[in-house]
Amino acid sequence: MSGKQKPKFEVRGYSEHKAPKPASPSASTILVSPNNEILLLHRVQTSSAFPSAHVFPGGNLEPSDGEVASDPTDVNRHLENIAYRTGAIRELFEETGILLARESRTAESLLPVSTAVRKEGRESVHKGKVSFKSWLSSISPNAVLDTDRLIPFTHWITPPNVPKRFTTQMYVYFVDPAEKGNPSVHATADQIETMTPEWRSARDWLSLARSGDIILFPPQFLLLYLVSEILDGPGDSEEDILRKRAILKRRIETEGTPVPWKDKFISPIGMSFGEDGRSVLALDKPGPELKASTLKGDDEYVVLVKFNREGPRDVEIGLRKEVLRERRERGIDKPSKI
């Protein structure tokens, strides 16, 4: 890239970074509305992570969320557990004001909490004046976080060449159609790290990214792609909505190669690049910290992406075998330095 500014975001081979920065445990939630729309946040330019990108709500775990192993190479540090689930719900609350909690362990519906009470609690939790769990107990003594309804949906580890790295557990949460009038599921901006939260269909988010109107990083793009294939299918009745959710849940829990999507650990790695300016990212490796483990990524799909100064552009998902064959036949494929 002689004479040009280097892209802010790239993905290269593991071999180029023998000692990557430790990956911070974090969690993120793909929140599905009663109408099967997806909530994304637009991070401001000065945000500490993924500036100007549209992202799922989420962030770093805190000690109050629960214990995770301190050694970055310890497999247990990366495995899904109650700390990740608690962190996902806490971060969702801090960033959007949405509260996924029930009045008790036996309650079926979400705890309704007014906008004013949530706003005050959100500010206190974010500033560290009170822990998230303590605040919840103060407004409803028997309340519990709705961690059981979080569905694990891949775990991502930032590539080794990126200075700020995360080991991120992704979840899906379906807001029950019966909760439409519950104030606890109404999102508002936090005025700190994000702009206004917005609900759109997964199809619409992908379309905006393809047209260049928004930035989606490869993990968000891939997960929206997989969600859109099912949730954006025909039918808008409540019966259709619930049917499509059941299909998506089954896909996450039982489909995928070599392991189901709920069990995939993915650290994108540059596989090849072409004269079209796009890299092909393989998704089958779990990351340098986990290379000695039995954890696996995905060997069916690849991500095609062009890394520009402002972030990833021209992102697309393809079947690995088909993409590599087509690029070789067209003569636009070159091996990476892996």
Residue locations for each model-derived region?
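N-terminal leader/linker segments that precede catalytic domains of diphosphate-processing enzymes
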Residues: M1-I338
